[in-house]
Structures are given as C-alpha cells and as structure tokens.
C-alpha cells in the first residue's frame, strides 16, 4: 500500500502545520490513547500520564517528531524508521495492535486542531501514512 503523489503532498502539507506544535499534539494524542484504551498505560508505568505532564509532553513530542521524520522520507520509510523498528521489536515489545489505536487518537487530535485542513482526502492520506508507519515499526516482530 504505497502513498500516491497527492497523498504524499497531503501528508507533507499538514506536517508543516503540525511541526510547530509537535509536543502538544503528541501529548494530546497520548492522553486520548490512555483515556480511551487504558490497557495501553502498561507500557508507560514509569510515566506520569496525568494531563499536562512533562512525560506526556516529552514522549508525545518524540512520537510526533518521528512521524515528521517519516514524512520527510516517504519514499523510504524502512530506512527512515529502521532504528525505531528495532527498538519496538526487540526492546519495547509493544503489542502491534496498539499502533492502530495510537493512529486513531492521532487522527482525532489532528481533526480537532486542523478542522479546515483535515478534510476527507487529508484524513485518508494520514490514515494510510500512519498504517504504513505501523507496518514498518512492526516489520521486525517475530
């Protein structure tokens, strides 16, 4: 499932608006994840997952900035995400199903913050992009 040129353009265009708010967007998406799917908190037992915490801001920023790196390398996601793929497969061992849950909460957060820009075509492009990212991140799981 490869992104079309128009889907790539939609991902990159929205990323330019997300980038200045990466930590806040990421923190909000993680907070939505933990509230909607409390079982996902098990991977973050060492974090303060309360609203506005520094842990949510820091990790949310890492997550969203990793997506930014992926958006800059849409033609070679495998190489761009190789280190993260190794980390998730061999160290963190995150349940692959959680990537779909996080994808959903990221999209909800984007829809809230970018109501005008996050139209149906952009949402479809981001859904496909996040699915491709999840596929790469879980590609080394056995």
UniProtKB/Swiss-Prot annotation:
Keywords: Heme, Iron, Metal-binding, Oxygen transport, Transport. Residues 2-142 form the Globin domain. CDD domains: Hb-alpha-like. GO terms for molecular function: heme binding; iron ion binding; oxygen binding; oxygen carrier activity. Red blood cells. Heme b binds at residues 59, 88. PROSITE patterns: GLOBIN. Signal peptide: none annotated. Pfam families: Globin. GO terms for cellular component: hemoglobin complex. It comes from the Eukaryota. The keyword Metal-binding applies. InterPro entries: Globin (IPR000971), Globin-like_sf (IPR009050), Globin/Proto (IPR012292), Hemoglobin_a-typ (IPR002338), Hemoglobin_oxygen_transport (IPR050056), Hemoglobin_pi (IPR002339). Belongs to the globin family. This is a larval (tadpole) alpha-globin. This is Hemoglobin subunit alpha-3.
């Amino acid at each position: 499932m490869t992104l079309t040129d128009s889907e790539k353009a939609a991902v990159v265009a929205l990323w330019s608006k997300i980038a200045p708010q990466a930590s806040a967007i990421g923190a909000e998406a993680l907070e939505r994840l933990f509230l909607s799917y409390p079982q996902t908190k098990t991977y973050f037992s060492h974090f303060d997952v309360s609203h506005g915490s520094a842990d949510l801001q820091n990790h949310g920023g890492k997550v969203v900035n990793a997506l930014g790196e992926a958006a800059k390398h849409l033609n070679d996601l495998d190489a761009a995400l190789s280190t993260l793929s190794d980390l998730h497969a061999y160290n963190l061992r995150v349940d692959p199903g959680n990537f779909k849950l996080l994808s959903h909460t990221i999209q909800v957060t984007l829809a809230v913050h970018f109501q005008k820009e996050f139209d149906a075509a952009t949402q479809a492009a981001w859904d496909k992009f996040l699915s491709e990212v999840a596929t790469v991140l879980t590609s080394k799981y056995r």
